[in-house]
Amino acid sequence: MVAEVDSMPAASSVKKPFVLRSKMGKWCRHCFPCCRGSGKSNVGTSGDQDDSTMKTLRSKMGKWCCHCFPCCRGSGKSNVGTSGDHDDSAMKTLRSKMGKWCCHCFPCCRGSGKSNVGAWGDYDDSAFVEPRYHVRREDLDKLHRAAWWGKVARKDLIVMLRDTDVNKQDKQKRTALHLASANGNSGVVKLLLDRRCQLNVLDNKKRTALTKAVQCQEDECALMLLEHGTDPNIPDEYGNTTLHYAIYNEDKLMAKALLLYGADIESKNKHGLTPLLLGVHEQKQQVVKFLIKKKANLNALDRYGRTALILAVCCGSASIVSLLLEQNIDVSSQDLSGQTAREYAVSSHHHVICQLLSDYKEKQMLKISSENSNPEQDLKLTSEEESQRFKGSENSQPEKMSQEPEINKDGDREVEEEMKKHESNNVGLLENLSNGVTAGNGDDGLIPQRKSRTPENQQFPDNESEEYHRICELVSDYKEKQMPKYSSENSNPEQDLKLTSEEESQRLKGSENGQPEKRSQEPEINKDGDRELENFMAIEEMKKHGSTHVGFPENLTNGATAGNGDDGLIPPRKSRTPESQQFPDTENEEYHSDEQNDTQKQFCEEQNTGILHDEILIHEEKQIEVVEKMNSELSLSCKKEKDFLHENSTLREEIAMLRLELDTMKHQSQLRKKKYLEDIESVKKKNDNLLKALQLNELTMDDDTAVLVIDNGSGMCKAGFAGDDAPRAVFPSIVGRPRQQGMMGGMHQKESYVGKEAQSKRGILTLKYPMEHGIITNWDDMEKIWHHTFYNELRVAPEEHPILLTEAPLNPKANREKMTQIMFETFNTPAMYVAIQAMLSLYTSGRTTGIVMDSGDGVTHTVPIYDGNALPHATLRLDLAGRELTDYLMKILTERGYRFTTMAEREIVRDIKEKLCYVALDFEQEMAMAASSSSLEKSYELPDGQVITIGNEWFRCPEALFQPCFLGMESCGIHETTFNSIMKSDVDIRKDLYTNTVLSGGTTMYPGMAHRMQKEIAALAPSMLKIRIIAPPKRKYSVWVGGSILASLSTFQQMWISKQEYDESGPSIVHRKCF
């Protein structure tokens, strides 16, 4: 990145500090704009540094120029200051300091993959590099190579799996399932899963096969592993789960499948990254959007306390930042260093992100302010206020208004200007009026009683009538303009009207009685109104008596000064004094003048009363109009309020309906989703059935398909493949369960043990045989034996092979149907066939006609067969076989002094019987020899080292087959049973039966059995008939060998029962096709 100067030492004298060099080599040219290729630095380009000592390296670092380190040079933000300011420290300390250079010196490398020396919270992606295995052929065995390459034929792979442990691990702890899953060999994965291999095995990096399948994007293998129950939440050595790798690969379908199978969406790796934080850190916008829809935690923190928003800002991804802001994420959260997302955006010069954060903050502030001023609450308050106002108007409760309408103020100003305008033209009359108004001593502005009469007060202008009319109009206009003002100041016009009427009535009453009323206080507006009314009344009186100039001012003055009351009316005069009146020269004239004045006075009072009444009515009408107008306005506002409330309730109902529709849509979507899932399941089942049908067709068309042959004996189970000479698996048909619960946690004690494993642990187990006398009595244990046969002994999948089963003659029909049902429904076999054991034994000897005496561990049968067909009416059954002989030997050994009581000890006695016992040709003679000599005695060493001696017991035990009375049974011996079976057959075939008597079963393996049978049957049969006893050397397995021969025939495919036939007819089809 940066070039070297001439002062750099030679390359041969340098040592390579490889960690620092690898970090320095990954810084990009954007962080070193001026030093790249220049002579200002001693450090060369990426990977081109020479080896030097620590001192030389520090001297180089000190010569980096200030242009490449604008803020750290000489500041406290970096531990690498100016040239020569370095401390002497080890390489480790220097590396730790270099990791602390601030983001201003490394603007583009911070938080990105270009540098390993970024911010203090950067992560490495070594866990996601090179997902596939590095495989060398010499490190893998045969099975692992087949699993990795997947180019092995299916048959060969099946054979390989049969002989190899499917869970075997190589040097790197990889199983075959790991390799097949990582390389996408779905066929091999399916075979391994069918063999029930272990699913959660970890390789050297603690990854399961599912983790490798997801990491390598092998979706088909991953889905198969999920369906078989692999845990998707097992972390590897980096702490990553399968969901982390799916998110890193931007595989939304796989991520969705993992979540459906229980993957933890909030799991964290060793860096504290959840799948969402990993997607943000790697700038995977689509999967981030997917995880947000899946309700991933947006406030999750990594190990440095950083949220998804801070990581998105550090990565410079404006699109992810915008996506997160749409989810109302907290933008004020801080990491462990105390920095917020905005501070990171500013320090990294991400202007677009800064703008996004600013816009988001403004929207949040607007949202908060709009929530504080809730329109619905304002509507409610407005409605309540209007209701209170309307209620207050009805209850006559006046309200105070903070402001008057501007028009009222303008009206007042106009009236005052008009009055001033007319004052200059009506000086004389207004002076008289003003003198009359202000002459009294009261301070209420009303007209007091006149004290003196002067000629100056009786002077009027010539144009009296014109002035009078002008003044009347002026006063009338002024009153009309003042009336709305008075009504606006009072919030209850009806009450004011009522009070005004009452006051006027009181005034009239007071004027009649000559008693004026006094008021303690009154608003200024009432005082002004009284003055105007008084002036108006004076003008009206002047109009009535316009011809007499003296009377008008006299009456006006007398009316104004008659009393000191504040009601504004004109009371009558109470007294006449000589000082206040001028009399004429003669007494008669004085009398007539006084009478005329009294009459005139009375008439004026009546006129004043009528005028006042008319004015009151006019005032009432105007007030009523004002009240009606206000009521109309109130009714209009109430109507608007009701309309608004109705509209609000309608909107609420619509919102409720929308919510109900939304809930209904959600419910319908859930039902559709459930239906889709059910459809998917049904389709999967149909596909599985089709696959099984295809497999069955392949098996039918392929002549080389191996048929499994299983001989279910009462004591031993023999199993193998058709065409083989001998069975591959022979084990006791026995199931053992622990007698007591295991006390040690590490013993891995099973619930049950089968076959040889059960026999080897018989000391701590309770052993049971699921078959008694050739009939299955415990189907659960029998199913365990079959499962053990398929998966542990033969290591095959039963759903891939047809099966031939054997059964004893005279088996109940219900047992056959149950056996058929288990094979098709539990083990999903494609086809099966059931054959009688005696017939298969005859096939082994190469005959189709003869009589088979089959004696095993639980039962003995004699079955006559002619041309391959058994004769059921001549078939006989004897419940005397090897198990009864074992019990008899235990009894006679106990009589000898040896104690055998438990099930485990019984197995020891069975081993003695099979190894030492034989059939005596002449039982009486043998008994005599044993009694006279000890040469017939034999020794047997028990498992504990004890040696027991056996005398005549070793031939007395098999003698019970010929003399059942030894066991307390009243039945015939095996020789008589064979003879009786022949005699029940047709006469024409008896000769063939005598000459083809075949011995079969493990109980017939005693030495001397064939000779004794020849002797006993010859003694019973007619002398002219030839008796021939056939005893094959491998008659212990003759039933299984006969089944192998039958299943290998080309016509066997036409004999078996297919899965399709079973589905159509049920278990009862076994009687029609097999018997």
UniProtKB/Swiss-Prot annotation:
Q: Which GO terms describe its biological process?
A: axonogenesis; cell motility
Q: Where is the composition biased (Basic and acidic residues)?
A: 377-392, 401-424, 466-483, 495-530
What SUPFAM superfamilies does its record include? Actin-like ATPase domain, Ankyrin repeat
Which residue ranges have biased composition labelled Polar residues?
A: 485-494
| Alphabetical UniProt keywords | ANK repeat, Coiled coil, Repeat
Q: Has UniProt tagged this entry with the keyword Transmembrane?
A: no
Region Actin-like: what ranges?
703-1075
Pfam families found in the cross-reference section: Actin (PF00022), Ank_2 (PF12796), CCDC144C (PF14915)
Chain coiled-coil ranges: 413-436, 642-698
Q: Kindly list the GO CC terms recorded for this protein.
A: actin cytoskeleton; actin filament; axon; cytoplasm; extracellular exosome; extracellular space; membrane; NuA4 histone acetyltransferase complex
**What molecular function terms (GO) are annotated for this protein?**
protein kinase binding; structural constituent of postsynaptic actin cytoskeleton
> Per the record's keyword annotation, is Hydrolase included, yes or no?
no
List the residue ranges of the region (Disordered): 369-530, 544-597
Spans of ANK repeats, please give. 172-201, 205-234, 238-267, 271-300, 304-333
The entry sums up its family as follows: In the N-terminal section; belongs to the POTE family.
Tell me which PANTHER family the record gives: ACTIN (PTHR11937)
Q: What is this protein called?
A: POTE ankyrin domain family member I
- Species source reads Homo sapiens
